[in-house]
Swiss-Prot record:
Keyword Phosphoprotein: no
Upregulating conditions: Up-regulated during early stages of myoblast differentiation.
Known glycosylation sites: 60, 71, 93, 184, 270, 512, 720, 754
Segments in the Extracellular topological domain: 26-850
Protein name: Brother of CDO
CDD domains: FN3 (cd00063)
Stretch forming the signal peptide: 1-25
Localization of this protein: Membrane
Lineage of the species this protein comes from: Eukaryota, Metazoa, Chordata, Craniata, Vertebrata
Organism: Mus musculus (Mouse)
Disulfide bond positions: 52-101, 145-195, 247-294, 339-386
Record-linked Pfam families: fn3, I-set, Ig_3, ISET-FN3_linker
Residue span of region Disordered: 407-458, 561-610, 809-828, 1065-1110
Length: 1110
């Protein structure tokens, strides 16, 4: 019993000693986060739980929210912390952001990768009009649904025949993209289709405002055409996910669809299979990136006409490893940590020491993906973290740095070994890299150069500043497909500064981040390097620095693209390749774009920063996809690293042709990061990855020198017979951001070998297009360019050859051909080959108002020109009608029959053959003689040139025979029905004097006037008092019409209507008095010779006759 009691204290002491030893061992252990918090999307008011597991487990765990420490639970914020668990009771706008857990122990601290908490939401559908979709019967129809913005991604539903379809069924196939494919469409599938978006977190459902109407048509034969997609597509997929490339074709007979990848048949790839005509790729990997071609053919038309291309990019989450050059660093020496990062797109990198972000300083030098600590001291001990993040995930790796006194020997323990990197953490959605301070991607290995000196001590141990960045002279483009000539020079050549010992040049392919940097050491006296074994049509980045006795100097950077190698099946022209690189120079399709399939631009590549002046820098970037609409502008934002705050707008409204801008007004000694956004008419892109930190060091004395690299002509186009339009691009970084004043454009006929034949146009400012006019028709021209400033001109650009259009003749001799513009032609697909130097006219949105105004004005002028002849005709018709009313058919009267009526006043009665003449009681009167020509009487009305003969009463006795033939009394019908007219016979003349009344026929007689070929005069005695009176009941306004007796026989050519003769015995009884009251009064409207008849008020003329003699 006593022995047992003595053994218990001993066992307890041993246990305490073992626990203490374990704790002491754990004190030197590197902390790790074994379970990272996961990004979450939650609805407003929902509960969010974030977990964090650390090793060793007894470590203290704290949390950060948007970079700020959370001191335990915050009731006001609604955040509760229990060791490794953070709970948000009710999510709101104030608790949305980025969270990190931090594990602390005496050896140091480590932070987890950030977890993003996002508020779920579902936006409304954009307003759209109804679309009519036509498809041939038996083919596949595609109904596209343009889902609104949603977090997380919305699920699509379709209204089909009054029923909502949530999953594929029957011949209805819902694709991952949200499109509805109707297989083997028939007449029964016609109708209206609408789609709806469903958010699985908020459980909201929103329906599109307009639907699409499907029409199924029947055709006899139609060539194959691809109805979806309508243009080349760029698809981004995360590694390990499945991918479906849609390709739907239509035609009669139904076409056959084939696929190819990078010019080779898709049959060689085992991971692909077909879903109808769509291509399905299981478990994508990096090797699945490339260009896929879908081709449809049915034997009708051109077999290669229906082609569409997909550009597939496989994104990979980051993979990080960190290395320490020396495990234990004596005080006063330098330590170098290298972080190797892989991922696509290239991840951004952030360095931390004991969970605190690091910035560049005199002792801490952040260069690419390396961290160098100069003159290590005890304060530099701790846990160093390399954290990488891109759009599809994040990862980090840690290493512990230990220091020792110079005279102390310390064996490295297990804690000095690098810690394996954590697996990549995929975000719940593409993360926002701008919300975390990071360093730009770069993989740095110690330079391995044969010219590297053995000692970097400066003579006299004087303090020397690092070498300045060299000036890169090479153009960012090369026509070579597998090599690139890199040319540079020292910034201050021949100066008394510390001499450069050697250069280190690194290059790597941007689109393939898994490749390591290729590093080359170049002697100080060599300023040229040829980079070989490059891939055609690929984007590369180059970083180089000069080394002097102070170590590595400032870095100069350039990005270039190699030339494309033509392929027999898939060929992309240089112009269209440039268009993909420079969305600002993109061609617009002549067809109306489908706005539903368009989107804001893609985020540009990470910008590079170079020194401009003491307080300014140049920010340079490379754009990506434009989302279907040309990029309208860029904007640059910056952020100070040592201050907490949001990103600040530095400048905006940067033209799409400019890929570099100077940012001024920076503070000395402050570290900045920059990012770029692209904007088109549909909105702005996501921000680019932030640049690496830039410290304003106060460099001054910059000299603006002559530009070396010239612009690059992207395409040319013949507008008409005498004009050629060209566009170009210019990257200031190719001339080390040297400012320029403008451009010189040189052109000459291609068949000329004399350089003096070049003509020069000058373009000033930031304009990147020009029209060369006054050229010769159907002539080929060589075109090249230079940029210039006060220092001189640059080297010549590439030479483009373009031929003007031929002059078109109308085919009529002696008439010059009309000036016509060539009709605009739709540009081909981006990836189809076209000879360099040709292109379609660039359609600009600013031309639309002028086009509308021109159409409206043209229509107005056309209407006016059309109505002027009509109005003139109407006026002429009215004038002619008015003239006819005054004298009907006067122009039709024959010249062979003319007459003149002159009133006889006071003519005494005379007789011929026992019949009295017309006469009067007093006065003198002259009567016009009726002239006859070959049996046809003449009238002065028809031929006013002939003067009538006048006779006085004394002469009438000798003209009895003529008078008898003239005083015949026909009655003019004047267009009225003669059968319905009553002949009024005058009573016996009481006074022996009768009145004879006469009036011309009105315009109704036009219908009865007919020309006659011959007229005959007949001598016939008439009674002087014979008259005819007509009354018409239908026309009460017309009281009477009287016609003097001219001649008898058939109607003459003078155009008078038939007359009616009345016997003398029945016509009138003569007396000594006047006419009875039953006589209607007649009117006579007439004018003198040479005047026209008009419908003026009637002039009453009376003829008195003596009583007849018995």
């Amino acid at each position: 019993m006593t022995t047992c009691r003595r053994e218990r204290p001993i066992l307890t002491l041993l246990w305490i000693l073992m626990a203490t030893a374990g704790c002491l061992a754990d004190l030197n252990e590197v902390p790790q986060v074994t379970v990272q918090p996961m990004s979450t999307v939650q609805k407003l008011g929902g509960t969010v739980i974030l977990g964090c597991v650390v090793e060793p487990p007894w470590m203290n765990v704290t949390w950060r929210f948007n970079g700020k420490e959370l001191n335990g639970s915050d009731d006001a914020l609604g955040v509760f912390i229990t060791r490794g668990t953070l709970v948000i009771a009710a999510l709101n706008n104030h608790t949305v952001g980025r969270y990190q857990c931090v594990a602390r122990m005496p050896a140091g601290a480590v932070a987890s990768v950030p977890a993003t908490v996002t508020l779920a939401n579902l936006q409304d559908f954009k307003l759209d009009v109804q679309h009519v979709i036509e498809v041939d019967e038996g083919n596949t129809a595609v109904i596209a649904c343009h889902l609104p913005e949603s977090h997380p991604k919305a699920q699509v539903r379709y209204s089909v025949k009054q029923e909502w379809l949530e999953a594929s069924r029957d011949n209805y196939l819902i694709m991952p993209s949200g499109n509805l494919q109707i297989v083997n469409a028939s007449q029964e599938d016609e109708g209206m289709y609408k789609c709806a978006a469903y958010n699985p977190v908020t459980q909201e459902v929103k329906t599109s405002g307009s639907g699409d109407r499907l029409r199924v048509r029947r055709s006899t034969a139609e060539a194959a055409r691809i109805i979806y997609p309508l243009e080349a597509q760029t698809v981004i997929v995360t590694k390990g996910q499945s991918l479906i490339l849609e390709c739907v074709a239509s035609g009669i007979p139904p076409p056959r669809v084939t696929w190819a990848k990078d010019g080779s048949s898709i049959a060689a790839y085992n991971k692909t299979r077909f879903l109808l005509s769509n291509l399905l790729i299981d478990t994508t990997s990096e090797e699945d990136s490339g260009t896929y071609r879908c081709m449809a053919s049915n034997g009708v038309g051109d077999p290669g006409a229906a082609v569409i291309l997909y550009n597939v990019q496989v994104f990979e989450p980051p993979e990080v490893t960190v290395e320490l050059s020396q495990l234990v660093i004596p005080w006063g020496q330098s330590a170098k940590l290298t972080c190797e990062v892989r991922g696509n797109p290239p991840p951004s990198v952030l360095w931390l020491r004991n969970a605190v972000p690091l910035t560049s300083s005199q002792r801490l030098r952040l260069s690419r993906r390396a961290l160098r600590v100069v003159s290590v001291g005890p304060e530099d001990e701790g846990v160093y973290q390399c954290m990488a993040e891109n759009a599809v995930g994040s990862a980090h790796a840690v290493v512990q740095l230990r220091t020792a006194r110079p005279d102390t020997t310390l064996r490295p323990g297990r804690d000095t070994k690098p810690i394996a990197a954590t697996p990549p953490m995929p975000p719940s959605r593409p993360s926002r890299p701008d919300q975390m301070l990071r360093e730009q991607p770069g993989l740095v290995k110690p330079p391995t150069s044969s010219v590297q000196p053995t000692s970097l001590k400066c003579p006299g141990e004087e303090q020397v500043a690092p070498a300045e960045a060299p000036i890169i002279l090479s153009s960012p483009r090369t026509s070579k497909t597998d090599s690139y000539e890199l040319v540079w020079r020292p910034r201050h050549e021949g100066s008394s500064r510390t001499p450069i010992l050697y250069y280190v040049v690194k290059h790597r392919k941007v689109t393939n981040s898994s490749d390591d940097w290729t590093i080359s050491g170049i002697p100080a006296n060599q300023h040229r390097l040829t980079l070989t074994r490059l891939d055609p049509g690929s984007l590369y980045e180059v970083e180089m620095a000069a080394y002097n006795c102070a170590g590595e100097g400032q870095t100069a950077m350039v990005t270039f693209r190699t030339g494309r190698r033509p392929k027999p099946e898939i060929v992309a022209s240089k112009e269209q390749q440039i268009q993909r690189d420079d969305p600002g120079a993109s061609l617009q399709s002549s067809s109306q774009p489908d706005h539903g399939r368009l989107s804001p631009p893609e985020a540009p590549d990470r910008p590079t920063i170079s020194t401009a002046s003491e307080t300014s820098v140049y920010v340079t970037w490379i754009p990506r996809g434009n989302g279907g609409f040309p990029i309208q502008s860029f904007r640059v934002e910056y952020k100070k690293l040592k201050k907490v705050g949001d990103w600040i707008l530095a400048t905006s409204a940067i033209p799409p042709s400019r890929l570099s801008v100077e940012i001024t007004g920076l503070e000395k000694g402050i570290s900045y990061k920059f990012r770029v956004r692209a904007l088109n008419m549909l909105g702005e892109s996501e921000p680019s990855a932030p640049s690496r930190p830039y410290v304003v060091s106060g460099y001054s004395g910059r000299v603006y020198e002559r530009p070396v690299a010239g612009p690059y002509i992207t395409f040319t186009d013949a507008v008409n017979e005498t004009t050629i339009m060209l566009k170009w691009m210019y990257i200031p970084a190719s001339n080390n951001n040297t400012p320029i004043h403008g451009f010189y454009i040189y052109y000459r006929p291609t068949d000329s070998d004399n350089d003096s034949d070049y003509k020069k146009d000058m373009v000033e400012g930031d304009r990147y297009w020009h029209s060369i006019s006054h050229l010769q028709p159907e002539t080929s021209y060589d075109i090249k360019m230079q940029c210039f400033n006060e220092g001189g001109e640059s080297e010549f650009s590439n030479v483009m050859i373009c031929e003007t259009k031929a002059r078109k003749f109308s085919g009529q001799p002696g008439r010059p051909p009309p000036l016509t513009l060539a009709p605009p032609q739709p540009p081909p697909l981006e990836t189809m080959e076209r000879p360099v130097g040709t292109g379609a006219m660039v359609a600009r949105a600013s031309d639309l108002p002028y086009l509308i105004v021109g159409v409206v004005l043209g229509s107005i002028v056309l209407i006016i020109v059309t109505f002027i002849p009509f109005c003139l005709w109407r006026a002429w018709s009215k004038q002619k009608h008015t003239t006819d009313l005054g004298f009907p058919r006067s122009a039709l009267l024959s010249s062979s029959c003319q007459y003149t009526m002159v009133p006889l006043e006071g003519l005494p009665g005379h007789q011929a053959n026992g019949q009295p003449y017309l006469g009067g009681v007093s006065g003198r009167a002259c009567v016009s003689r009726v002239h006859g020509s070959r049996g046809c009487p003449a009238a002065t009305v028809g031929c006013p040139g002939r003067k009538p003969q006048q006779h006085c009463p004394g002469e009438l006795a000798q003209q009895r025979e003529d008078t008898n033939s003239q005083l015949r009394q026909p009655i003019v019908s004047n267009g009225y029905d003669l059968q319905n007219q009553q002949v009024a016979r005058g009573p016996q003349c009481a006074s022996g004097v009768g009145a004879f009344l006469y009036t011309l026929p009105d315009d109704s007689t036009h219908q009865l006037l007919q020309p006659q070929d011959c007229c005959h005069l007949q001598k016939q005695p008439v009674t002087t008092c014979q008259t005819a009176v007509r009354r018409t009941s239908e026309s009460p306004g017309l009281e009477s019409s009287w016609d003097p007796p001219y001649h008898s026989g058939p109607r003459c050519c003078l155009g008078l209507v038939p007359v009616e003769e009345v016997d003398s015995s029945d016509s009138c009884q003569v007396g000594g008095g006047d006419w009875s009251s039953q006589h209607p009064s007649g009117t006579y409207t007439g004018q003198e010779r040479g005047m026209r008849f008009s419908p003026s008020p009637s002039v009453h003329v009376s003829f008195e006759t003596p009583p007849p003699t018995i």
